[in-house]
Amino acid sequence: VSLAERFSRGLVDKSLNSCTRWAEHKVHMPNPFPGLINFDRFPWQREVLDIDEGSVTVQKAAQMGFSIAGLIRSLYCTVEQQRDVLYVLPTQGLAGDFSKARFDALIETSPELVDEFKNVNSVGLKVTRKRANLYIRGSVSSRGLVSVPVSSAVIDEFDRCADNTLDLVMERLS
């Protein structure tokens, strides 16, 4: 890689000051929409991804792209902000399937993410090269939720999660 290319990449990286800007340059989508992500299909994701608040709640219909938004936000917080993140789904089975089908697909199609997660990339734990952790857990087992201190969390399909999920997750936030 030439000096000019490294300089150019450095300038681009410094301009990636929001979750959506970062995603547009770093996240490649798998089929059926291969290539760098854009928000044309789901423009409402931009606002949700770039909110800088302590807590964000989204009431939504099915198939609106918010699982992808949660996934992207989790990757951004872990990779770019070097924060530990907990991603919660209703059951451990769903969490495992989601990890393999969605997280791994995004990581495998995004060259910079492949490099970022090459050391530890298991079903329930993904670790960046700078040692930030992304935990993927089901809500049914409280043991899986209480054993990880994190600074950010995403609860996906909250209405299908165990009753005490929000309380357990809030206790984990440091």
Predicted regions and their residues:
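Phosphate/NTP-binding elements of NTP-utilizing enzymes
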Residues: S2-S174
